[in-house]
Amino acid sequence: MNLEQLYDVIVVGGGHAGTEAALAAARLGVKTLLLTHNIDLLGQMSCNPAIGGIGKGHLVKEIDALDGAMAKAADQAGIQFRILNASKGPAVRATRAQADRVLYRKAIRTQLQSQANLTIFQQAVDDLKIEGGLVTGVVTQMGLTLKARAVVLTVGTFLGGKIHVGMNQYAGGRAGDPPSIALSKSLRDLDLPVGRLKTGTPPRIDRRTIDFSQMVEQPGDTPVPVFSYLGTASDHPQQVPCHITHTTEATHDIIRNNLDKSPMYAGVIEGVGPRYCPSIEDKIVRFADKTSHQIFVEPEGLTTEEIYPNGISTSLPFEVQVQFVRTIKGFENAHITRPGYAIEYDYFDPRGLTSFLQTKAIPNLFFAGQINGTTGYEEAAAQGIIAGMNAALQIKDQELWCPRRDEAYIGVLIDDLITCGTQEPYRMFTSRAEYRLLLREDNADLRLTEKGRQLGLVGDERWESFSKKREAIESTQALLHNSWVRVHHNDLFKEALLNPMQHDCRAAEFLKRPEINYQHLLMMDDLNLPELPQEITEQIEIQNKYAGYIDRQQQEIEKLRKHENTMLPETLDYNDVVGLSSEVIQKLNRIKPTSLAQAGRISGVTPAALSLLLVHLKKSRLPV
């Protein structure tokens, strides 16, 4: 059966990538359809009930700067908030929220249902309609054909999903949900480069069977942080503590003695698991010298008794899970409400994508999320907003966009994927970015909101709030630059100054001192500085205190910008470039980098190879 209505964009999958993709496309004004196998599970947190963390929190702030949904939902669902690396520099500080699963789903669904140009329909997709090298729609499980001018696939772990508990295995997209077997086969028939990955989740435990007196309480931060630039602490529900416990040597003995029953170690699972979120079996084997491992005991919500024991992801048989869980401090009488499991699923080599997340083989087919080899809600959502936006821009015949590596962690994420690919689930860290000092959580809006407004992503409320904030920062910085702190002010600041001033200096220069903050300057009545919110004074302080380092990174970026702007034609045959090794030729012909800078980030492409490319471009009279 055909549904005659033509949609501009169809998004397949209602997880973190799919919801951001659908909202982004709809915000750009195109007719968008979001397809999900279960409307009640839109925005479902399939694994850990948390948002943010090192690198991940930066992505959430960037999504928010582009008017995405994740940060707002986290504020409305967060039951504990913490700033990680709070004692370190601003580049690596990161917000993390423990979230109530039910409240998070509710917040996401509310945003979806209130979005203009967006329709939600409950149907799983079994096939794509391809005509003339383009996707023209999708076919659902009940045989319904839905037409579209562009399709975004955000199918998570559902493609060919297989769940493992011990030696038992069964088809599933996640616990309790069916896999996408037919769609997996359809995509494999398109001859796209496919692989298998694996992830896992720990058993859930009944809170009432836990002895918290044996654990260390971990309270949230006060004052309570917020994720969204539009958020306030009043958005948060009731705040609750988490706890920390540890495995014991008895735990390790049980796991070691049952490794032959682990599908991972028995060779049953072919997919590669996440390096930075290993199973408890992996930890015991890889870190054999450790006598204990830390476990974060995290509540799943305010209206459930289930606890998420972060750190014991496992696919061991259920009876073994019961045994080892009860050797953990405080879990001696634990009742497992849901077993832990591993799940294998299909992913497609992201080197088959452009930087706009469109497939090179089918230009109006976009991929986002775990289908591209990433792991994590935040990584998925970041890809979703870019894929949905670009699908809409393509429909509107406008220039597609993706942030550069020096503009956003989203740019780092996508460039890493499309340039290097991945053989294991990819997770974002601040260490992946060359320009961390520029890509801070606190300035994501200053980096991205204006561009988001130009693209049509950012609504009036956010734009007005951002414009006021930016104006306050710029006007205050000008005031600081044109105001002077005199030597006679030493007495005023004698409690704070590590060393007295030897000469007069501009207020902006005085603020560079590590012991001085904006509040100190307010003590000087003759400066006439305005009282400002904390998030604005923080930005002013960082811009001044780190000005030298920031300028240095900007200079490095300008040097590299020439390579970023040296475009490599898609039709360039690297076999024609004299002097390149066969390895480099093979990689360049496969990946087809769009710029000289991207070519330089491909493993094995040396500076000498880049010089040969430049010579070839000049000889061929191609634009350099």
Curated annotation (Swiss-Prot):
Keywords: Cytoplasm, FAD, Flavoprotein, NAD, tRNA processing. Its cofactor is FAD. FAD binds at G13, G14, G15, H16, A17, G18, V125, S180, Q370. GO terms for biological process: tRNA methylation; tRNA wobble uridine modification. One of its GO terms (cellular component) is cytosol. Its main location: cytoplasm. PROSITE patterns: GIDA_1 (PS01280), GIDA_2 (PS01281). InterPro entries: FAD/NAD-bd_sf, GIDA_C_N, MnmG, MnmG-rel, MnmG-rel_CS, MnmG_C, MnmG_C_subdom, MnmG_C_subdom_sf. SUPFAM superfamilies: FAD/NAD(P)-binding domain. NAD(+) binds at residues 273-287. Pfam families: GIDA, GIDA_C_1st, SAM_GIDA_C. SMART domains: GIDA_assoc_3. It comes from the Bacteria. GO terms for molecular function: flavin adenine dinucleotide binding. It is found in: Cytoplasm. NAD-binding protein involved in the addition of a carboxymethylaminomethyl (cmnm) group at the wobble position (U34) of certain tRNAs, forming tRNA-cmnm(5)s(2)U34. PANTHER family: GLUCOSE INHIBITED DIVISION PROTEIN A, PROTEIN MTO1 HOMOLOG, MITOCHONDRIAL. Homodimer. Heterotetramer of two MnmE and two MnmG subunits. Belongs to the MnmG family. This is tRNA uridine 5-carboxymethylaminomethyl modification enzyme MnmG.
